[in-house]
């Protein structure tokens, strides 16, 4: 089995932990990101999704587990945020990413999806498409991109849904894609549902690594209960 085939096999039917702290939060340091990554692996995660060069370098020093690397940018002339530039591809590979993920949505962009894919292939890394719909995913699949993520489903519109897009997982899987289900998988039951729907692997982020979000969910539920109690009187 080749190294790339072995890497694909490691992820199959597994959990990928996205260790991306809230920007500027108390957890937003490379050392803490690396610690979160190691804790996730100790809990059974088979891979990691890490943003930023310094974070990837820190995680790579701590583990040889598969890393999906991304760089997020806020561009003045494009809504594309995830790994938009060719130099991002080179930097991610040099930092230690095994898989390079990039936005493949049909939006105005500084570099074409095909050019990003070719540059990532040239580094020897595997590739992942962050798609928003079936058209994005199929285009990426036909280009030869190794993994198709549902990462951006619901995030290219004004209102973000509360539930994950299991229908998109099924559509892509039936088309022969290696689907990495991602986006709003906030419970073990939803992660299992993604595998049942045909996902190759499932990425979970906020529900594992963003303490602010998790605490917010609990606080909201408690407040809702308090409101319901008050309306009873």
From Swiss-Prot:
InterPro entries (UniProt xref): Aldolase_TIM, NanE, RibuloseP-bd_barrel
Catalytic activity, as annotated: an N-acyl-D-glucosamine 6-phosphate = an N-acyl-D-mannosamine 6-phosphate
Biological process per Gene Ontology, one example term: N-acetylneuraminate catabolic process
Alphabetized SUPFAM superfamilies for the sequence: Ribulose-phoshate binding barrel
PANTHER family: N-ACETYLMANNOSAMINE-6-PHOSPHATE 2-EPIMERASE-RELATED
Function: Converts N-acetylmannosamine-6-phosphate (ManNAc-6-P) to N-acetylglucosamine-6-phosphate (GlcNAc-6-P).
Record-stated family: Belongs to the NanE family.
Name of protein: Putative N-acetylmannosamine-6-phosphate 2-epimerase
Gene from which the chain derives: nanE
């Amino acid at each position: 089995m080749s190294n790339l085939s072995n890497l694909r096999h490691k992820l199959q039917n597994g959990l990928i932990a996205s260790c991306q702290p809230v920007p500027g939060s108390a957890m937003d340091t490379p050392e803490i990101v690396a610690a979160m990554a190691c804790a996730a692996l100790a809990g059974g995660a088979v891979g990691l999704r890490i943003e930023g060069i310094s974070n990837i370098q820190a995680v790579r020093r701590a583990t040889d587990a598969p890393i999906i690397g991304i760089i997020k940018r806020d561009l003045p002339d494009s809504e594309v945020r995830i790994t938009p530039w060719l130099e991002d591809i080179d930097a991610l590979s040099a930092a230690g990413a095994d898989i390079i993920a990039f936005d493949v949505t049909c939006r105005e962009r500084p570099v074409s999806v095909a050019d990003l894919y070719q540059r990532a292939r040239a580094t020897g890394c595997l590739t992942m498409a962050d798609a928003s719909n079936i058209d994005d995913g199929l285009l990426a699949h036909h280009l030869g991109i190794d993994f198709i993520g549902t990462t951006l489903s619901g995030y290219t519109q004004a209102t973000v849904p509360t539930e994950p897009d299991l229908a998109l997982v099924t559509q892509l899987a039936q088309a022969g894609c290696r689907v990495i289900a991602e986006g709003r998988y906030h419970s073990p039951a939803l992660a299992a549902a993604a595998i049942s729907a045909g996902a190759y692997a499932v990425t979970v982020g906020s529900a594992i690594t963003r303490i602010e979000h998790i605490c917010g969910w609990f606080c909201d539920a408690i407040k809702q209960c308090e409101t319901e109690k008050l309306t009873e009187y």
